[in-house]
Amino acid sequence: MGRAIAITTRHGSVDAWRADPLDGAQRGALVIVQEIFGVNEHMRTVVERYAAEGYVAVAPDMFAPVQPHVELDYGEDGFARGRELASALGFERAVDIVAATAAQLREEGHATAAVGFCWGGSVAYLANTRLGLPAVSYYGARTVPFLDEPLRAPMLFHFGADDASIPEADIQAHRERQPDATVHVYEGAGHAFNRDVDPRHHHPASASLAHRRTLKFLEVALA
């Protein structure tokens, strides 16, 4: 069961959703970086699923410096507002919030990685290049402008082959410009294929395979 906590950041106190393994057997810690829709019920569930796999998982309220406690729906209005909030926050502040969250987890003695989804996938990538965190990026569509930043830790990318927001040329750019990263592409999957509360986007087979690959990656990266 998750609970609300607070993270002290350079941009003020940021609320977060945290879940810990019930059996106390901890594999490490994860900063879960939200989609543009906020730390909503789906993201809280993601946090709790990783806790069930043995990880201390924390999803900070990334938009808190702009508008705290955002939970948007998946319609056009929610998408538009989420893009506005992501733009207003900017990547610099986003990385700062991840840094503060990771620092708190490391102070507790946990080896820490970042796992991000959609916009959060691009933030997770920057947490690798700028903070040195092992990272997993699910369909991060805003990573291409930053691909010349060198990786500082293991990196895993998941992309849907049918994701209109991330064309094949962009996926190939990830392979070519970050050859040390692992890139997986899922046939039949589009954007947000892990979002199981959204039947328009969820692709169960791809989500299941990506999750298994993520767990294997984290097992090695946080060893």
What are these regions (language model features)?
Residues M1-A223:
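N-terminal cap/leader regions of alpha/beta-hydrolase-fold enzymes
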